[in-house]
Amino acid sequence: VPTTDGLYLGLISGTSADGIDAALVRFEAGHPSLVAGLTHPWDDTLRRRILAVAQDEDRLALDDYGRLDVAVAHAFTDAARAVLDKAKVSHTAVTAIGSHGQTIRHRPDGPLPFTLQIGDPSVIAERSGIDTVADFRRADVAAGGQGAPLVPAFHATVLRPENGARVVLNLGGIANVTRLSAGGDVTGFDTGPANGLMDAWCLRHRGEAFDRDGRFAASGRIDAALLAELLDDAYFVLPPPKSTGREHFHLAWLDTHPRVADNTPEDVQATLLALSAVSIADAIERYAGDASDVVACGGGVHNAALIRALAERLPGRELVTSSVFGIDPDFMEAMAFAWLAYRRLRGEPGNLASVTGARGPRLLGALYAAP
């Protein structure tokens, strides 16, 4: 197996499309460390288009799909260039880019399961001059898996405890949990919404992309009856392996609940925050009840109200962010896709069947050569 140590660049935009996270990662003897990270902003028009498509408010004609695929690739390349500029590193020093792309549809269940990420990797490889690994999820779906979450395999590499059990909690648009133990299988799944619904509600009522520090939610009161209705969704009682996304938990789903219209915007936001906290805490209690600590990462770590609500609902467990372990919580996922590119070039599988439900380990991603 080639060593393939060196510099890799991970790129991802999550379900909230709140920016493209770029992480420049150095691998030494297989151990990853962050050299530089940044979040590259979306052009506002492009972001709104992505969200409209992901929420099925915009039925794309094929020509529009093709153009959006390339526009996203241009934005991803700009993010890659920006993080290289920040680190003062030449593109020639980077072994490969691992590009997750932008998910616009995730349907891993049913007779013809699929997952769809855009951001043409041929364009990224051509414009960046760096070999690019992309299309990480579809091999797992083809093997009967959910294609998500993929980050637990990386969590197991960098955060496995020396004894006992630990939960890694990723607070993106969607929340996912990973249960790690000193020995034994890694398990993980999407619990439901984290920031995605709150972000969308905040954009609708405040014109802001996210609820800074959770202040909008903190200004409202939880409607217990509405919360119970939202928690009644069938997804919350599905056993793992399971994954979800914006095509399920979006504003149109929220609007199907009549009590929403009876509440003030801030009371709905407070209730959405409670939905995230309760569904996450319930999932941890049910499937990782033996974990003594919860390590949080993702954009949601900056929502002080959400972190407080989680701490209240996880008594007896230490809730910390991944920065305690030297991993920037904002770039855990981008680092994971740099790691997946590293795995691909080494010819090593990137999925965990115990997490995704796939028939077995699979090589993830395809390689797009730079000129």
What are these regions (language model features)?
Residues 5, 19-43, 187-277, 281, ...:
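Conserved ATP-utilizing enzyme core subdomain
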